[in-house]
């Protein structure tokens, strides 16, 4: 695998990805939400620039779609440094990592997405690079093999993960800065929707933006996706103007309810209610019943349902709460109303 294959070029994407790239903020001032993280990172960046030093290695974690990659890009822009992007699964061998590290310029930022998926050999190779900016590689084979230590330019590693608990302690402890991204509130999401609409030249009223924000499950990526789909609906039905009624109508067609739950979320809750008497039920059993992978439920479904108080995770499995029954219009397991019965 050549070095160029190991890096992700953000310009080499389809049109949808280019749209996503175009609406990303490029500075902390334009980065909406996550105020505690922003204020801390601004302080750390100013201190590093004042010392003319590298920024400490950063670990950013949180549920998918909250802006980990965007924040890494913003940090690179604020530091006025180069930005190289790769991902844990791509780095299969120590040589893959070495090919990237030896091409870095001084003070560059290397971003590794899904860093929890680094294999053991690559992770071990990374340790001296993080601590001492040195790289130990094995040259030759068999009895003729020997270790060579290479000097690396000073750099900053930014790792992103949705599963911080899967990182080994030695790797986690080598990050000087650890930031947790949290779900966004509705007001911040409304601002994100309005900002994206302005960049994409989408006509939207304030109440229309609020309706999309309320159904975006606290996640900017979902807010921007829903904005683009509601735009499609408005282009056909409402002369391209997104107002509240059009947003509601479009989101009902997309089967996104007022709490932001999509069909997979409702299937998850309904199966626990109807097949397993409200739980508890093991995740593997639940995944089989739904026909989805365990990781999909853990990463994409459960975090928001837990945050909204719809499910509980216990040692015996998953159980639903009274709030879930109330939201789906059920009392003691009997359906009294179906929002999407049409």
Swiss-Prot record:
GO molecular function: ATP binding; ATP hydrolysis activity; four-way junction DNA binding; four-way junction helicase activity
GO cellular component, one term: Holliday junction resolvase complex
Record comment regarding domains: Has 3 domains, the large (RuvB-L) and small ATPase (RuvB-S) domains and the C-terminal head (RuvB-H) domain. The head domain binds DNA, while the ATPase domains jointly bind ATP, ADP or are empty depending on the state of the subunit in the translocation cycle. During a single DNA translocation step the structure of each domain remains the same, but their relative positions change.
UniProt family annotation: Belongs to the RuvB family.
EC numbers, comma separated: 3.6.4.-
Name listed for the protein in its UniProt record: Holliday junction branch migration complex subunit RuvB
Keywords recorded for this protein, A-Z: ATP-binding, Cytoplasm, DNA damage, DNA recombination, DNA repair, DNA-binding, Hydrolase, Nucleotide-binding
Region entry Small ATPAse domain (RuvB-S), spans: 185-255
Catalysed conversion reaction: ATP + H2O = ADP + phosphate + H(+)
Positions annotated to bind DNA: 294, 313, 318
Organism lineage string: Bacteria, Pseudomonadati, Pseudomonadota, Gammaproteobacteria, Candidatus Pseudothioglobaceae
SUPFAM superfamilies documented for this protein: P-loop containing nucleoside triphosphate hydrolases, Winged helix' DNA-binding domain
Location of region: Head domain (RuvB-H): 258-342
Main location: cytoplasm
GO biological process, one term: DNA recombination
A Pfam family of this chain: RuvB_C
Cell compartments where the protein resides: Cytoplasm
Function summary: The RuvA-RuvB-RuvC complex processes Holliday junction (HJ) DNA during genetic recombination and DNA repair, while the RuvA-RuvB complex plays an important role in the rescue of blocked DNA replication forks via replication fork reversal (RFR). RuvA specifically binds to HJ cruciform DNA, conferring on it an open structure. The RuvB hexamer acts as an ATP-dependent pump, pulling dsDNA into and through the RuvAB complex. RuvB forms 2 homohexamers on either side of HJ DNA bound by 1 or 2 RuvA tetramers; 4 subunits per hexamer contact DNA at a time.
Gene designation per UniProt: ruvB
Claim: Transferase is one of the keywords in the record: no
Subunit structure: Homohexamer. Forms an RuvA(8)-RuvB(12)-Holliday junction (HJ) complex. HJ DNA is sandwiched between 2 RuvA tetramers; dsDNA enters through RuvA and exits via RuvB. An RuvB hexamer assembles on each DNA strand where it exits the tetramer. Each RuvB hexamer is contacted by two RuvA subunits (via domain III) on 2 adjacent RuvB subunits; this complex drives branch migration. In the full resolvosome a probable DNA-RuvA(4)-RuvB(12)-RuvC(2) complex forms which resolves the HJ.
UniProt binding sites for Mg(2+): 69
Chain positions covered by the region annotation Large ATPase domain (RuvB-L): 4-184
Enzyme category, top tier: hydrolase
Positions of ATP binding: 23-24, 65, 68-70, 131-133, 174, 184, 221
Organism: Vesicomyosocius okutanii subsp. Calyptogena okutanii (strain HA)
């Amino acid at each position: 695998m050549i070095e160029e294959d190991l890096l992700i070029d953000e310009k080499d994407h389809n049109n949808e990805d280019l749209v996503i790239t175009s609406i990303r903020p490029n500075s902390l001032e334009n980065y909406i939400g996550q105020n505690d993280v922003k204020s801390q990172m601004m302080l750390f960046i100013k201190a590093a620039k004042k010392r003319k030093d590298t920024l400490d290695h950063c670990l950013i974690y949180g549920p998918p779609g909250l802006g980990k990659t965007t924040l890494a890009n913003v940090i690179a822009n604020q530091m006025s440094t180069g930005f190289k992007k790769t991902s844990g699964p791509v780095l299969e061998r120590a040589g893959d990592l070495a090919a990237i590290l030896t091409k870095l310029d001084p003070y560059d930022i290397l971003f590794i997405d899904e860093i929890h998926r680094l294999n053991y050999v690559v992770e071990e190779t990374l340790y001296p690079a993080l601590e001492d900016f040195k790289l130990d590689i094995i040259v030759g084979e068999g009895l003729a093999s020997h270790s060579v230590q290479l000097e690396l330019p000073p750099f900053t590693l930014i790792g992103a993960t949705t599963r911080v608990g899967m990182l080994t302690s030695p790797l986690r402890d080598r990050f000087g800065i650890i930031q947790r991204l949290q779900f966004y509130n509705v007001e911040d999401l409304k601002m994100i929707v309005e900002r994206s609409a302005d960049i994409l030249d989408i006509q939207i009223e304030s109440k229309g933006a609020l309706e999309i924000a309320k159904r975006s499950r606290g996640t900017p990526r979902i807010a921007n996706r829903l904005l683009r789909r509601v735009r499609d609906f408005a282009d056909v039905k409402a002369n391209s103007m997104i107002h509240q009624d059009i947003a509601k109508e479009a989101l009902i067609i997309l089967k996104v309810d007022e709490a932001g739950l999509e069909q997979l979320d409702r299937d998850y809750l309904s199966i626990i209610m109807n097949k397993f008497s409200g739980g508890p039920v093991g995740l593997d059993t639940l995944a089989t019943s739904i026909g989805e992978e365990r990781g999909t439920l853990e990463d994409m479904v459960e975090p928001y349902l837990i945050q909204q108080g719809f499910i509980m995770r216990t040692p015996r499995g998953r159980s639903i709460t009274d709030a879930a029954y109330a939201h789906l219009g059920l009392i003691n397991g009997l359906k009294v109303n179906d929002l999407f019965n049409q």
